[in-house]
Structure formats: C-alpha cells, structure tokens
Amino acid sequence: MDRNIRDVDDVLKLLDGLFAPEADRWTADAAGWWNGFYGDRTKAVPFFVAKPDESLVAYVDRGWVAPGRALDLGCGPGRNSLYLASQGFEVDAVDLSDEAIAWARERTQEAGARIRFHHGDAFELAGSALAGPYDLIYDSGCFHHLPPHRRVSYLALVERLLAPGGQLALTCFASGAMGSELADADFYREPGLHGGLAYTPESLRWIFSDLTEVELRRMRDEPADSPYFGEDFLWTALFRREDTSA
C-alpha cells in the first residue's frame, strides 16, 4: 500500500511521474536527454549561436535592467550569461546538462569572463548553491519546457530568489507560432509535453500576476548576420517585483 503523499512536494513528484521518462525535460533525470541534445555542437539549432537575445540587449540598452546579481536559468552554452557578464553583472548560471555547462565554460574562458556555473536542477539548488537575492532572473526557453504543475515550483523559485525591485525576464513559445496548445489538463490525459507549451499574452500575465509587467511582446526576428539572437515564434517578457519595504 502506497500512502506517501504528505506535502506539496510529494504531490509535485507524483505528477512528475505521470509523464513517461522520455518526456522529462525538467528534472535531474532529464540530464541525459539534454546531454545528447548539446553533444553535437554542429547541429543547426538556432540558440547554439554565440549571440545574446535581442530582447535582453534592449532591456540593458534602455536602462530597464541595470548591472547587479543575475541568475541565468537553463543557461545552455552560456550566450546570455556571457553578455550579462560583459555588461558588469555578477552571474550565476545553471543547467541540467553537463555538456551544456562544459560548452559554456569553454566560451567563458575564451572570453576571459567570470561566471559561476552550476550543474543540476534549479528547483533543487534554489536557496543553497543558488543563493539569492538576484536583481535579475533570466530565462531564455526554460519555462515552456515545464509541465503545468511545475509552474508552482517556478513561481516559488522566483519568490525565493528574486530581490525586491528585481526583475524576471523570459522568452517562451508563442501561441499560434510554436509549441503545444493543449489545455493544461490534457497533458495529464496523454502525458508528454509535445515539444513544449505555447502561451498567450493573457496566460503569461495571469501566471505572473504577482509581478508588474514592464514589457510583453514578440521577439524580433533577427537576420543571420545580426549580432543578436531573435526568433519571432517567441514571446519576450519583462516583469518587475515591486519593493514594498519602503
């Protein structure tokens, strides 16, 4: 007899288990899949380029995001981490894949930058290796690979690690352009993430309604010779956590 559910973490792990192992992209058990993904650096994957997101550059150029402590969630080969470090940020970067981390470290060494890389599950590392508060939490393509129930964990991570007055910036699949448009409940009837979840502007505003929206728009499509990364099948969003201490 199995009567092991006692708290929210137990419920989340139970729901994780409803997905076939090969559909897992968000727990430490998914590291092998991501290692295979990052293992061939010659693949024509858009975000393998050594370019920062055009939206991130725009936030910094406009003065919306100022240098401070930054956390890059799902950093991959480190393209956005490197940009942040070049702009004077103190950067922690985390990824499930040690292949991605190794690649990012190589790029960092070549650039002569300083970034603290962490291999593992950000949800498990939050509060220990990933010790906030951070002035910026940056997520380029991690959020849309989470199953619906793990938004609870994501919001808890933001609540725990984002400084008052700090900002959350993310890119994710845009409804009608990329990603699955199944209703949340349907992912538990036919487990699998179908490549990632699409979001509408309304759904993003609702999910992050405890934060203040600064900007929410489609990412600008960047040509191949641009120094920036941009794909118009993505939303790019910037939210601020209000400082209520005053």
Regions inferred by a protein language model and the residue ranges of each:
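Class I (Rossmann-like) S-adenosyl-L-methionine-dependent methyltransferase catalytic domain
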Residues: 1-73, 77-132, 146-161, 167-246
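Conserved acidic residues
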Residues: 135
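A conserved beta-strand element that flanks and buttresses the S-adenosyl-L-methionine
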Residues: 138
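Short catalytic micro-motifs in class I SAM-dependent methyltransferases
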Residues: 141-145
